[in-house]
Design a protein with these regions (language model features):
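Glycoside hydrolase catalytic-domain context in secreted enzymes
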Residues: 1-763, 777-782, 786, 878, ...
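Short, hydrophobic beta-strand segments
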Residues: 753-771, 900-903
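Residues embedded in well-ordered secondary-structure elements
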Residues: 451-453, 494, 677, 695, ...
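Short intrinsically disordered coil segments
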Residues: 721, 735-737, 769-771, 810-812
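A glycine-anchored, Pro-Gly-centered beta-turn/N-cap motif
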Residues: 501, 769, 774-776, 907
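Extracytoplasmic
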Residues: 777-779, 786-790, 794-928
Length: 928
């Protein structure tokens, strides 16, 4: 037996023994997510990475799993105990499939922890909202359930995605999220910390984007913060991002240099082609960019994970022997609970719950009424219930009418003058003289250039498969070939094909339709959409036959906004808004059910309907959960984990990542919104009373009483928000610091205890580069949402008094308090392996608050002027103390020390570095 196989030894010692037995080539074979086998040591081939956003994900119908609600829906439950149960299910089902295929399935990718400061992000459904405390609590519970409670072994190892500031899709492989140390530590990092320090996450995936100029997989804080402070196990790159460092980020000229930067900054495993990684490793070694010790550190980190999974320990690891099943009745029951708990009642004038009399009819109308869509990170459920069928199972088929509300169109070719018809094999030909059943298509128009045509004759989507054919069961693949991009052209329509490169749909000489390179629109490229049926009018006619309408609108999670594509706006598709107007005029008793991956701007819609119920694409139990909620058998209590804005006009540019300076998210934005963070209604009412506080070691204990003053049992999500009233720096207007979902029977009272841990109140002190608890006055507000505050009290809490900046020590420019200037920002220096401040040729200013000036007569400024000469002026408040001219430099990172003579000044004032011209500043230090 090899020493590394001795289960009586500490795992770290066993890993070191294994490394001692490996050859250099064998170690290099373990640097990618496809870890090569080492037969002589009985080490199997191993794959890192199985998706787990909504439970175990296999897109193979032969591998069914329990499909949870979308993560943004799970977050809306505000129920960590439920998250833990869901994590256990995901972990157990991963173990089940790992026993069938032992080389994979246990190193999981998920949950997605990126804070969602902008609802237009294409992957909003994957995240847990905009608040880092909520994200941390919910994902800590989910990952703990996946990992298990054993002190030595892990059921699975979840990897948090995507560290960090990954909240846009456009140009994600090359763009830079411009962030500051405060926004990183207080917002973007903080969201990840909970699942690592207090949860079960032992791995992390670096994001595609850059962080103020440095690719996220080379961020030095992967080592300094994630590993050294949080003690995370290992870090992987996102898919193909290792090679993208050269090909897209252009961070380095060679893959060897990129690998060296990744390894030295804490990234251990490259999610990339193993041959490319191997070649880069040998090149880096030959050039002296890395040592074998660098490889040992990375390989040891990921191999420690494999040891913790019990790969080498047989029955000594309890997770190798515990029962593991998939899609069990217990799993289904927990999943139904999750689907019901994430039902969020946004608006209700009293029509809900529905009070149906015997024989009354319900019309389910709308494009989401008979669908149960999957997004990309979704497994295959063994069953699925849509909203129409959920109601029919409870009310009877004859009592539930249905219409999808889609327009029916025919597509006429300008070239042939004929209509597109569906042949027996599904191929489309522009050859029909008249419109019959084979020429009719349901027009699924999702707006923003995303349309599908659904053939009425065979219930198949039109897809591009060489020629265009009506043969697709559903739009579901990485590339959506059913995607048509309509564009008006005079009185005709042009269709772009699904490809990201410009391609047109054009009629060929044989009458078939093909995708051809984009060119000037000729007759072959022009079509007319001829209306056959007006879907809104048809739906309105059906609505008149019903006593109540359940109008189901929302998004298709594989189109418009998803991975690779951000949402251009917050509006519902135009066809759906037309449908709402027609149906509610036909029947005022219209309940709007929004089935969506993200929030919409529903301001005008809310004025038109008596109730709005929101659900995410909630998995197999969607229809059951909606039906139970509409009928009053489930009392909704979910809360919005992300703000619903009135329109996109209320949002800054999607690339604005500095939430503090830009007043982004509910933390800093005090403007009017549609539904605030934490909003959610109930079928009953609750009263709050008796808020008290008691200081404890490590935090503050709050107690209050919640009374159910209505006639229905229900859950209430009690939320506690904090505000620092006397802080040295700009702090949030409100920040969630504790919450609890409690069940309160009608007419009864429930005591609620909330503990606010100190870490929830800390902020990042840029003067000393650490998170601190600041001494001072704090307001604590308890309520049903961030805007519905019921009780409040103030406390003086112990902590640190933030000292004045010590100008006698180096002051890094990145640690400014405020800045001004059109392009004043931070960038990253590979030479310094740190960030620096820079301006464009219009100049700018960096301000360092409350600096201690002690009659200094000189300063040393490390700066560069990468174009023409620039000038840096040093101020104490409004008083200029001195200036220095920076001569032209070789590059923005060509820092040199420049001596500045100063007028003596004593006292505490803001240090201002006013820059005239294009310049870079790394640090400044004052002296005699």
């Amino acid at each position: 037996m090899w020493k590394f196989q001795d289960t009586s030894l500490p795992m770290e010692e066993r890993v070191q023994d294994l490394l001692a037995h490996l050859t250099l080539a064998e170690k290099i074979g373990l640097l990618s997510t496809h870890q090569l086998p080492i037969p002589r040591l009985d080490i199997r081939e191993w794959y890192i990475g199985t998706e787990v956003a909504r439970g175990y994900v296999s897109r193979d119908p032969e591998e069914p799993s329990t499909v949870f609600p979308q993560p943004i829906g799970m977050a809306s439950t505000f129920d960590p105990s439920l998250m833990y149960q869901l994590g256990e299910i995901a972990g157990e089902e991963a173990r089940f499939y790992q026993r069938k295929d032992p080389k994979s399935h246990l190193m999981l990718w998920g949950p997605t922890v990126d804070p969602e400061r902008d609802p237009r992000w294409g992957r909003t459904e994957e995240g847990y909202g905009e608040d880092p405390f909520l994200i941390g609590e919910m994902t800590a519970a989910y990952t703990q359930g996946m990992a298990g409670e054993d002190p030595v072994y892990r059921r699975t190892i979840p990897a948090l995605k995507h560290f960090c500031a990954n909240n846009n899709e456009k140009n994600r492989g090359s763009c830079s999220a411009n962030v500051t140390p405060r926004t990183l530590h207080e917002y973007y990092y903080r969201a990840f910390e909970g699942a690592v320090v207090r949860g079960g996450a032992d791995s992390m995936m670096a994001a595609y984007n850059e962080l103020s100029g440095v690719p996220a997989c080379m961020n030095p804080d992967l080592q300094h913060v994630v590993k050294d402070q949080w003690h995370l196990g290992f870090v992987v790159t996102d898919g193909a991002d290792f090679t993208q460092n050269v090909l897209m980020h252009h961070a380095f000229a060679t893959h060897a240099e990129a690998l060296a930067a990744c390894l030295k900054n804490g990234c251990d495993v490259m999610t990339d082609d193993e041959d490319a990684v191997t070649a880069a490793a040998w090149d880096a070694l030959d050039r002296g960019l890395i040592t074998e010790q660098d490889i040992d550190r990375a390989v040891g980190s990921s191999m420690l994970g494999r040891f913790r999974l019990g790969e080498f320990d047989g029955d000594a690891c309890l997770y190798n022997t515990e029962p593991a099943e998939t899609d069990t009745p217990i799993h289904r029951a927990v999943n139904q609970c999750a689907a019901m708990e994430q039902m969020c009642l946004l608006h209700n004038t009293g029509i809900l719950p529905l009070q149906l009399q015997k024989g009354q009819k319900v019309a389910v109308i709308g494009p989401l009424g008979a669908e149960n869509y999957r997004d990309w990170y979704t497994g295959v459920a063994s069953y699925g219930v849509n909203i129409r069928d959920g109601l029919r199972q409870r009310l009877g088929t004859e009592q539930v009418l249905f219409d999808d509300g889609y327009d029916v169109v025919a597509v006429q070719s300008v070239l042939t003058g004929k209509y597109c018809t569906v042949a027996e094999d599904g191929t489309l030909y522009a050859s029909a003289a008249e419109i019959g059943e084979r020429e009719r298509f349901r027009c699924h128009d999702w707006d923003f250039g995303s349309m599908n045509l659904y053939a009425c004759c065979n219930d198949r989507y039109v897809t591009e498969d060489g020629a265009y054919r009506a043969t697709s069961a559903t739009p579901y693949a990485w590339f959506i070939r059913e995607w048509l991009k309509p564009e008006p052209y005079g009185d005709t329509t042009l269709f772009g094909s699904w490809q990201d490169i410009p391609m047109d749909v054009a009629v060929q000489p044989d009458g078939t339709l093909h995708a051809v390179p984009h060119a000037r629109p000729d007759a072959a490229r022009q079509f007319r959409l001829v209306s056959v049926e007006d879907g809104a009018a048809r739906a309105a006619a059906l609505a008149k036959q019903a006593d109540v309408v359940v109008l189901c609108v929302g998004n298709h999670p594989m189109q418009v906004a998803r991975e690779c594509y951000d949402r251009p706006d917050l509006e519902l598709p135009a066809h759906q808004k037309k449908l709402i107007e027609a149906v509610r005029q036909a029947n005022p008793n219209t309940v709007l059910v929004v089935v969506s991956s993200y929030p919409y701007g529903l301001g005008e819609v809310q004025k038109q309907v008596p109730a709005i119920l929101y659900t995410t694409h909630a998995g197999a139990e969607l229809g059951n959960a909606v039906a139970e909620t509409l009928l009053g058998r489930n009392n909704p209590a979910a809360r919005c984990p992300i703000t619903w804005y009135r329109s996109a006009q209320d949002l800054p540019d999607i690339m604005e990542y500095d939430i503090i300076q830009a007043n982004r998210t509910y933390l800093y934005d005090d403007g009017e919104v549609l539904y605030p963070f934490g909003h959610g209604l109930s079928y009953t009412t609750f009263a709050y009373s008796n808020l008290t506080a008691e200081k404890k070691a490590g935090g503050v204990l709050f107690r209050l009483t919640v009374e159910n003053t209505g006639e229905r049992d229900g859950d209430e999500v009690v939320q506690l928000y904090a505000q620092a009233l006397t802080s040295r720096v700009k702090r949030p207007l409100r920040q969630l610091c504790a919450f609890q979902r409690v069940h309160v029977p009608a007419g009864e009272c429930c005591p609620v205890t909330l503990f606010v841990p100190q870490h929830a109140l800390e902020f990042y002190d840029v003067t000393r580069e650490k998170m601190v608890m600041e001494q001072g006055r704090y307001a604590f507000r308890a309520g049903a949402s961030s805007a519905d505050i019921r009780l409040e009290l103030e406390l003086t809490l112990d902590g640190e008094t933030i000292p004045s900046r010590d100008l006698g020590a180096p002051v890094l420019c990145k640690n400014y308090d405020t800045k001004s200037g059109i392009a004043t920002t931070l960038q990253f220096s590979k030479g310094q392996n740190d960030w620096y401040g820079c301006t464009n040729d219009l100049g700018g200013e960096f301000v360092f608050a409350q600096a201690a000036f002690e009659n200094y007569t000189a300063a040393e400024l490390w700066a560069a002027a990468p174009c023409a000469k620039a000038t840096v002026r040093i101020f104490a408040g409004e008083q200029e103390l001195g200036s220095v001219e920076i001569p032209p430099s070789r590059s923005p990172e060509d820092f040199h020390p420049y001596a500045v003579r100063l007028k003596a000044y004593a006292g505490v004032a803001d240090l201002r570095l006013k820059i005239e011209g294009l310049a870079s500043v790394f640090r400044v230090q004052f002296g005699a």
